[in-house]
From Swiss-Prot:
Source organism per UniProt: Xenopus tropicalis (Western clawed frog)
Source domain of life: Eukaryota
One annotated GO biological process: protein import into nucleus
Family statement: Belongs to the OPI10 family.
GO molecular function, one term: Hsp70 protein binding
Protein name stated in the entry: Protein Hikeshi
GO cellular-component term (any): nucleus
Chief location of this protein within or outside the cell: cytoplasm
Function: Acts as a specific nuclear import carrier for hsp70 proteins following heat-shock stress: acts by mediating the nucleoporin-dependent translocation of ATP-bound hsp70 proteins into the nucleus. hsp70 proteins import is required to protect cells from heat shock damages.
Subcellular location: Cytoplasm, Cytosol; Nucleus
Claim: Translocase is one of the keywords in the record: no
InterPro entries: Hikeshi-like_C, Hikeshi-like_N, OPI10
Cystine residue pairs: none
């Protein structure tokens, strides 16, 4: 029903079913993991009006599991990417896995999926710094890249009087770079995926 993927590792599709509506994936050597992808395999959909709350668990200093709500997957949104690198300290949150005796070793974390009503899931608040990756992070990266390129290119600006004639060099007027920069920003604001066409 579910799959779990960590970069550089094989896809896991062998979730351990710990209750009728609860599934767990083990993540060995979790200390080196930054992001995890949780997805539905497409073989069995959630029952109507149901979805999956996705939790991350790591052992605290005493070896007890600390569970944190990452987010959700549903039939309409069957996959999600979660950042877990900043979650390996601090306190957990309320979770449905607390009363279960799920074995956990010191360097193994777990991803838990709890099948719940969509209405119940909507009332839960995932931890903020595990936010599912969205287009906003891509847009933010693109904006930083544009700013960096424009600042770098204009740092070499010289006036026409300062130019040394060199037939092997090609010069681009800074107003052309500025025009490109503004056009790219405008197009990104209208459609963040325009560059794919």
């Amino acid at each position: 029903m579910f799959g779990c993927l960590v970069a550089g590792r094989l896809v896991q599709t062998d979730a351990q079913q710990v209750a009728e509506d609860k599934f767990v994936f083990n993540l060995p050597d979790y200390e080196s993991i930054n992001h995890v992808v949780v997805f539905m395999l497409g073989t069995v959909p959630f029952p109507e009006r149901m979805g999956g709350s996705v939790y991350f668990s790591y052992p605290d200093q005493s070896g007890m599991p600390v569970w944190t709500l990452l987010g959700f997957i549903t039939n309409e949104k069957p996959s999600a990417i979660f950042k877990i690198s900043g979650l390996k300290s601090g306190e957990g949150s309320q979770h449905p896995f607390g009363t279960m005796n799920i074995p956990q070793t010191p360097s193994v974390a777990q991803i838990g999926i709890s099948v719940e009503l969509l209405e119940q899931m909507a009332q839960q608040t995932p931890v903020a710094n595990a936010a599912v990756s969205t287009i906003d992070s891509f847009t933010q990266f693109t904006q930083k890249m544009l700013d960096n390129f424009y600042n770098f290119a204009t740092s070499f600006a010289v006036s026409q009087a300062q130019m040394t004639p060199n037939p092997s060099e090609v010069f681009i007027p800074s107003n052309v770079v500025l025009k490109w920069y503004e056009n790219f920003q405008r197009r990104m604001a209208q459609n963040p995926f325009f560059w794919k066409t």
